[in-house]
Amino acid sequence: MTTIDARGLRCPMPTLKLARALRGAAAGEELTLLADDPLARVDVPHFCGEAGATLLGVEELQPTGWAFRVRA
């Protein structure tokens, strides 16, 4: 599983990093995006729907941020 650390980056950068990783991923491969920008909570699920990727889950990280599990 590939992990993309986009913590500290502001939107749209987390989504762009995910898009780049998905382009290089094999079908069915799972990726985890770490992001702490509040807009990512909205942007990433929307992007997954538009890109044909599957959002498997979102885990809230402490103290801030989220881990988005995505299947290519």
Regions of interest found by a model, annotated:
Residues 58-60:
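A short glycine-rich beta-strand->turn/loop micro-motif centered on a GG-aromatic cluster
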Residues 62-65:
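Short acidic/glycine-enriched loop/turn segments that link adjacent beta-strands
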Residues 67-72:
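Core SAM-dependent methyltransferase catalytic element
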Residues 6-56:
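Amphipathic, hydrophobic secondary-structure cores in small proteins
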